[in-house]
From Swiss-Prot:
This is C-type lectin domain family 1 member B. It comes from the Eukaryota. The gene is Clec1b. Residues 53-229 are extracellular. One of its GO terms (cellular component) is cell surface. It comes from Mus musculus (Mouse). The lineage of its organism: Eukaryota, Metazoa, Chordata, Craniata, Vertebrata. Glycosylated.
Amino acid sequence: MQDEDGYITLNIKPRKQALSSAEPASSWWRVMALVLLISSMGLVVGLVALGIMSVTQQKYLLAEKENLSATLQQLAKKFCQELIRQSEIKTKSTFEHKCSPCATKWRYHGDSCYGFFRRNLTWEESKQYCTEQNATLVKTASQSTLDYIAERITSVRWIGLSRQNSKKDWMWEDSSVLRKNGINLSGNTEENMNCAYLHNGKIHPASCKERHYLICERNAGMTRVDQLL
C-alpha cells in the first residue's frame, strides 16, 4: 500500500504460532516408549530367570534320577545274588537266574562274573585264554572274594597274581601290588616260582610252567531288574 508521501507501506501480519499440542503428544509417546522398554526388559529378565530356574531344576531332577537308579541297581544286585545263593543252597549245585547279567556258566558275585574252566594250562596260557573270553585271571585281593571262590572249587586254580622275578613285588593283573597287610601267600616263594594259584582257600606260589585249571573274571554289568520275579 502507498502512503501519503508516496512510500509503499508493507502490511506484514505476524504468523500465528503452531499449535503447542504437538509437543505434549511427542512427550506422551516418549513416556510410552520408555514404559514399553522397561516392561520389555523386565520380561526378558523374567524369562532369563525362568530359564535358569528350569535348567537348575532339570539338573536337580536328572541327578535325583541317577541317584534313584543307582540305589535301585544296588538293591536289585543284592536281591538277585541272594536268590542265586539260596537256590544253590537248596539244589546243592550251580544255579543260574535270569536276573543275572552274566553269560551262561559264569557265576554272578559282587560286581563281577566268574568263569571256572577245567583246562590244564600254564599260567601264561591261562592268561591268554581269559583274554579271549574278554576277561582276566581272577583277582582275589579281598577276603570276601577269596572265600566266595574257595567255596566253589576243590582243585588247584590259577589266579591273576604273578611277579617278574624273586626280587620284584607280586602284582595282580590290573597292575596293583599285593598288599603286605592283605592276602598272604602260603609256602615258599623260591626263585622260578613267580605265578600263583588258589587251593583250599589259600594262595600258593608256583612255577608258571605248571599246568592247572583256571578262573577268569570280568565286569558283570547291570542286574536285569525286570527279570527278578
